[in-house]
């Protein structure tokens, strides 16, 4: 036997269909748990599309891991299938706004995903103007489709509202002659609408839905529905209930629950355990928390991370001081002073105090930081305190990997 024969595991002793535990896996309807009402409401909003009529524009809110994207993708796929049965040509396009956050990136992604060989229209990755991308998109839509649903996932990550204006008013503005567009925006931020241009708000927010967090029972059911990702008999009885309880404590996040289950299996693999044991769940939860936060700050600027590092260091020092209350908040000036020290250590010029305030607001928008206003009386006036909502140890570890 050659050495290479010992390098790889030819038969996975833990997983039989690991894809069921991937976040981007779209399950069949029977595997979508606890969202029957939401799926029905969303389907009702876009139902006119199966007859070649304009679907309602929809905005979906809810915390991370509440099934928003999953249900929107499922309904979009079913609409295309049902429209085809009615003799209506339909398509759906998906944009990850965290990845394609500029207007040009987003419209290029949409045009590329709905383009077909029959159009003879070329959609390059780059090299043409935003206006040209739009012109080609409108041509493709009118040439190929009666109805198109466009899903903008993490819509709050878009740099501006320009593409929302273009899409929501394409028919009204005469950009499209026959094709009808429906937009489904998905956001983790319930206050996202407050940042919208009023004209966009009036046309995009025709229907709004809020997805509530899953409870422990629903999370348990979700993981049971995906447990055939594992080989028979490898999951100890307490694994799924334990993972469900941990995820329910963390705002009912199904994404985290599935991550924990997958990571627990991977820990069993790496330790050559014969079964996935309950003790692996706690280790898996720590890894899931780290990965979730790393994803949350993906794409943030160095100075955004320096500001967060300053608040994290203050939080860690406060925790070590037994006289300091838990969840201690810190004034902007204290955060700024430490931020300046970090900039000097990193050999970087510091930003202004005003810009650091803006960065702290951005962290608050992402629910990484909580801001509260206080009155210091006539002598001090009012001031803002910033409290880190994440585990400081997790933030410290992630920032250590991302700050060079």
Where are these regions (language model features)?
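A short, basic N-terminal segment
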Residues: 1-56
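Mid-core helix/loop region of P-loop NTP-binding domains shared across ATPases and GTPases
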Residues: 2-7, 13, 99-111, 116-166, ...
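Walker A/P-loop nucleotide-binding motif
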Residues: 54-76
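C-terminal helical "lid" subdomain and adjoining coupling/linker elements of P-loop NTPases
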Residues: 59, 233, 242-303, 318-323, ...
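Conserved catalytic segments around the Walker B and adjacent sensor/switch elements
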Residues: 59, 82-99
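Short, hydrophobic-biased segments on the C-terminal half of alpha helices
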Residues: 76, 164, 357-361
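Hydrophobic residues on short alpha-helical segments
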Residues: 304-312
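Terminal-proximal interaction/regulatory segments of ATP-powered molecular machines
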Residues: 322-404
């Amino acid at each position: 036997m050659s050495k290479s024969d010992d390098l790889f595991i030819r038969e996975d002793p833990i997983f039989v269909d690991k894809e069921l535990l991937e976040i981007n896996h779209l399950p069949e309807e029977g595997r979508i748990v606890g969202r029957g009402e939401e799926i029905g409401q969303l389907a009702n909003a876009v139902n006119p599309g199966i007859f070649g009529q304009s679907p309602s524009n929809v905005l979906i809110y809810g915390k991370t891991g509440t099934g928003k994207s999953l249900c929107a993708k499922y309904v979009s796929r079913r609409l295309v299938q049902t429209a085809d049965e009615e003799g209506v040509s339909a398509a759906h396009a998906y944009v990850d706004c965290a990845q394609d956050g500029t207007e040009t990136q987003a419209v290029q992604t949409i045009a590329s995903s709905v383009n077909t060989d029959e159009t003879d229209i070329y959609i390059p990755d780059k090299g043409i103007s935003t206006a040209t991308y739009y012109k080609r998109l409108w041509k493709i839509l009118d040439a190929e489709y009666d109805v198109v649903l466009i899903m903008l996932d993490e819509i709050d990550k878009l740099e501006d509202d320009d593409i929302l204006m273009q899409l929501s008013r394409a028919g009204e503005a005469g950009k499209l002659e026959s094709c009808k567009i429906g937009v489904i925006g998905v956001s983790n931020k319930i206050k996202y609408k407050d940042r919208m241009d009023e004209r966009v708000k009036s046309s995009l927010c025709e229907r709004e839905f809020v997805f509530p967090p899953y409870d422990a029972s629903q999370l348990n059911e979700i993981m049971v529905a995906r447990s055939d990702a594992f080989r028979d008999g490898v999951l100890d009885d307490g694994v799924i209930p334990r993972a469900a309880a941990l995820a329910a404590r963390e705002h009912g996040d199904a994404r985290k629950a599935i991550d924990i289950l997958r990571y627990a299996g991977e820990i069993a693999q790496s330790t050559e355990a014969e079964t996935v044991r309950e003790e692996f769940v706690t280790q898996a939860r720590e890894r899931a928390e780290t990965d979730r936060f790393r994803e949350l700050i993906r794409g943030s600027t160095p100075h955004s991370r320096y500001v967060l590092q300053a608040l994290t260091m203050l939080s860690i020092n406060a925790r070590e001081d037994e006289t300091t209350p838990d969840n201690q908040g810190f004034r902007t000036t204290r955060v700024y002073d430490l931020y300046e020290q970090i900039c000097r250590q990193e050999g970087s010029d510091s930003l202004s105090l005003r810009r650091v305030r803006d960065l702290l607001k951005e962290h608050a928008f992402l629910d990484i930081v909580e801001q509260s206003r206080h009155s210091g009386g006539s002598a001090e006036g009012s001031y803002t305190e910033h409290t880190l909502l994440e585990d400081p140890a997790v933030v410290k570890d992630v920032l250590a990997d991302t700050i060079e």
